[in-house]
């Protein structure tokens, strides 16, 4: 937000328009999760936010939840344009599970792999996924894999042992060049949110999972941006967040119906190609730039 002040000065000095690209909405997100509690600082950031929206010629947002939030703050609808974040669909793409290095290296061959890979923070309740795994521990073919930062994994390992989740494997982040094969090792990709996550939150992993061609199970609020994105794509199932039984039921459904998992993955891949490919996003930004300078 502070960068909006020099941007406005440069805009006035050179007579050029400002395009504000919103990847998050502050201070709303920080206040909602308790990272920002000082009332004076909240007022400062709120004032900067209003200034940024007022001085911008156009505001590009990454999802419809952002649009709804801005409209409640009386930002003119004609200022707002939705341009989603892109994914490299030539890099992240469906690959065969057979002879997959990630499966071989981690003894996952013959397993139904439920994969969560990414940030493990305040808004991602991975304990729910571990609890769901406990419900499935008697089905040896189902393996839950969580990939993340070492520090967060240490905390989860204690919880895993405490719950007796022997079917949960915790692994560190993989090198970027191995990401496509890691995603391809999964039968199901997970998106996890707490029930009270701010509604406009749009995890960037959704585009990546869709592009990988694997079915998604999203444990997210039904009225949130993430749920709408997955439902529109046709690439996954949405279940009640922080509900281990509901999550276990969804995992079991795809385990017992591999054809459904395949169909969801194919639909997700098609949606990613049509809506999240780099070329699509680039075209939208080119049109936006042409519009503001014409």
Task: Give, region by region, the residue ranges found by the protein language model.
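A short, well-ordered alpha-helix in the C-terminal region of glycosyltransferases
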Residues: 246-249, 253, 260-274, 284-287
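Carbohydrate-associated surface elements
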Residues: 65, 83-86
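Nucleotide-sugar-dependent
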Residues: 124, 173-184, 189-210, 216-228
């Amino acid at each position: 937000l502070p960068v909006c002040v020099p941007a406005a000065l440069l805009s006035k000095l050179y007579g050029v328009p400002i395009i504000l690209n919103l990847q998050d909405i502050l201070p709303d997100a920080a206040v909602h999760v308790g990272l920002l509690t000082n009332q004076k600082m909240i007022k400062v950031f709120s004032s900067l936010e209003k200034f940024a929206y007022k001085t911008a010629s156009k505001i590009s947002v990454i999802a419809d939840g952002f649009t709804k939030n801005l409209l409640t703050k009386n930002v003119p609808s004609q200022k707002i344009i939705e341009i989603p974040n892109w994914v490299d669909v030539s890099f992240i793409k469906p690959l065969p599970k057979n002879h997959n290095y990630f499966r071989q290296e981690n003894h996952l061959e013959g397993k139904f792999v439920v994969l969560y890979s990414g940030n493990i923070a305040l808004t991602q309740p991975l304990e729910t996924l571990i609890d769901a795994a406990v419900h499935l521990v008697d089905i040896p073919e189902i393996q839950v894999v969580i990939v993340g930062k070492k520090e967060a994994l240490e905390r989860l390992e204690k919880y895993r042992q405490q719950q007796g989740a022997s079917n949960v494997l915790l692994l560190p982040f993989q090198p970027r060049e191995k990401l496509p094969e890691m995603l391809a090792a999964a039968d199901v990709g997970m998106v996890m949110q707490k029930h009270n996550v701010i509604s406009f939150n749009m995890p960037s992993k959704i585009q990546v999972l869709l592009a990988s061609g694997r079915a998604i199970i999203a444990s997210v609020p039904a009225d949130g941006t993430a749920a709408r994105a997955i439902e529109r794509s046709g690439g996954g199932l949405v279940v009640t967040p922080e509900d281990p039984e509901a999550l276990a039921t969804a995992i079991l459904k795809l385990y017992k119906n591999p054809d459904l998992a395949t169909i969801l993955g194919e639909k997700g891949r098609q949606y990613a190609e049509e809506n999240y490919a780099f070329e699509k996003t680039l075209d939208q930004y080119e049109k936006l730039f042409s519009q503001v300078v014409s």
